[in-house]
Amino acid sequence: MIKILGIESSCDDTAVSIITENREILSNIIISQNTEHAVFGGVVPEIAARSHLSHLDKALKNVLKESNTKLTDISTIAATSGPGLIGGVIVGSMFARSLSSALKKPFIAINHLEGHALTARLTDNIPYPYLLLLASGGHCQFVAVLGLGKYKILGSTIDDAVGEAFDKVAKMLNLAFPGGPEIEKRAKLGDPHKYKFPKPIINSGNCNMSFSGLKTAVRTLIMNLKEINDTVINDIAASFQFTIGEILSSKVQDAIRAYEQITNNFDKKNIVIAGGVAANKYLQKILSSCAKTYGYRLIYPPIHLCTDNAAMIAYAGLERYNNKLFTPLNFSPKARWSLEDISN
């Protein structure tokens, strides 16, 4: 049986997973660093890298035990090798390459974004091509996923990522870190129409997005309010989340038009939303409705596979393993690595 070991360390989650050739997840362990970074209100790169270094060996041992797997049973080792916080990326990549060398097993360098892009093929086994909205704390882009290693970026944020906007607004409201889930929780209790926020470049006619102006508008409102109580916080969270939904819905329509100009596959019309923001149930509902209007089905991974995890890295490794796309051990990890720059 083919077993793929996946390692993810691009930000603040130390993750290790083992999956089989049949897309079965035997074990998927994530060691969160939230408590280590919460006091700073965001991720501190050096702390993250040191934490990966101390957690990876433990995570690997736990995955092997949970999956009843020996190291010698592993067919190949896939590790995030960019983009991300370079310290953590180097730690995970070096750990994987050391295992590869010691075990004489192939190494596969995985683009973290490709891991997110292919998650729906792990969970739903959907065919190529499909339209992807990658929405996380570090990235926000529409991508035509045409095949393995074949990606066309249709548009992206010109400033902040949408997940970053969630986290920064949460910090303005003195909510806990990470901010995305806290905003969603508070938004359920608030009035989404209480405050009217701007929707930058919503009528640009292309797939690019902007969230910096929205974030600034929230900050300005907070500074001008005489009192900030729970009701106000809930209303701001709800209004902010509503505005994000409006922006993304509009841009999904632009992305569908752009996507249909470069693909002729109209019998399987799938839109995938991946990345941490994909876990937001409000946005799932809004974007599902938008997709349905255009005859598309919106697919999103289960919550535990929306945020950073190693199962998605292992699966990307499986697709590359099946195509004999291995990576030399002298591969250099990358802090920046566009999906369009992936080579097969």
Curated annotation (Swiss-Prot):
Q: Which SUPFAM superfamilies match?
A: Actin-like ATPase domain
Q: Cofactor note from UniProt?
A: Binds 1 Fe(2+) ion per subunit.
Its Enzyme Commission number(s) read 2.3.1.234
Where can this protein be found? Cytoplasm
User: What residues does substrate bind to?
Assistant: L134, A135, S136, G137, G138, D167, G180, N280
Q: State any GO BP term from the record.
A: tRNA threonylcarbamoyladenosine modification
Residues annotated for Fe cation binding in this entry:
H112, H116, D308
This protein's source sits in the domain of life called Bacteria
What catalytic reaction does the record list?
A: L-threonylcarbamoyladenylate + adenosine(37) in tRNA = N(6)-L-threonylcarbamoyladenosine(37) in tRNA + AMP + H(+)
Gene Ontology CC: cytoplasm
- UniProt KW Cytoplasm keyword: yes
**Cofactor(s) needed by this chain:** Fe(2+)
At the top of the EC hierarchy, this enzyme's class is transferase
Molecular functions per Gene Ontology: iron ion binding; N(6)-L-threonylcarbamoyladenine synthase activity
Alphabetical keyword list: Acyltransferase, Cytoplasm, Iron, Metal-binding, Transferase, tRNA processing
Please give the function described in this protein's UniProt entry: Required for the formation of a threonylcarbamoyl group on adenosine at position 37 (t(6)A37) in tRNAs that read codons beginning with adenine. Is involved in the transfer of the threonylcarbamoyl moiety of threonylcarbamoyl-AMP (TC-AMP) to the N6 group of A37, together with TsaE and TsaB. TsaD likely plays a direct catalytic role in this reaction.
In which family does this protein belong, per the annotation?
Belongs to the KAE1 / TsaD family.
Name of protein: tRNA N6-adenosine threonylcarbamoyltransferase
Species, as recorded: Rickettsia rickettsii (strain Sheila Smith)
